[in-house]
């Protein structure tokens, strides 16, 4: 698995490339870092979404849904699907000014993958998350310190269910434990 330092290095290289290649990315990145600071785009704790049973549900900004399908290595939204390729890094975010479209930028393309309702209080961040298609076949997800957070829900092939929450400390978490109907 990638070390945090090597993952951050790949993110930094991609930020530089995407800023030169895509005017929409440059505008999103510049306005985001002007608001939150130059070091606001950081790797935190990558989570492996490969070796999972389809789909892994990815929620960005509370209401924007994407689906990762490991059997096809695709990230799916209502507008398009992106094949996650080995060795390619993808940054998820939105344009500035706000146009209600979630974008995936990579060295290969800029793609609109999902719509979101800009009337909600919490929308995806301009620079929100990263997905890395690792050289070894792993697919890693990480929230890049977005102000609106991310949720992953799915099941590994073991099978073992998981829910991962990337959020600021101010976000309240309400967990209701249910009595298990099956063996411990």
Where are these regions (language model features)?
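Intrinsically disordered, low-complexity acidic Ser/Thr-rich regulatory segments
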Residues: 1-122, 134, 171-184
């Amino acid at each position: 698995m990638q070390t945090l330092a090597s993952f951050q290095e790949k993110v930094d290289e991609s930020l530089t490339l995407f800023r030169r290649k895509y005017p929409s990315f440059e505008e999103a990145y510049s306005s985001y870092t002007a608001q939150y600071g130059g070091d606001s785009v950081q790797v935190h704790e990558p989570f492996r979404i490969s070796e999972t049973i389809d789909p892994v549900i990815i929620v960005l900004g509370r209401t924007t849904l994407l689906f990762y399908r490991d059997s096809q290595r695709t990230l799916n939204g209502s507008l398009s699907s992106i094949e996650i390729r080995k060795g390619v890094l993808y940054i998820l975010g939105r344009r500035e000014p706000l146009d209600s479209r979630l974008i995936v930028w990579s060295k290969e393309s800029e793609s609109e993958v999902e719509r979101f309702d800009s009337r909600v209080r919490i929308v995806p961040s301009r620079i929100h998350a990263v997905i890395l298609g690792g050289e070894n076949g792993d697919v890693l997800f990480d929230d890049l310190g977005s102000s609106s957070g991310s949720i992953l829900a799915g099941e590994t092939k073991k099978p073992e269910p998981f829910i991962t929450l990337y959020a600021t400390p101010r976000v309240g978490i309400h967990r209701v434990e249910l009595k298990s109907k099956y063996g411990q």
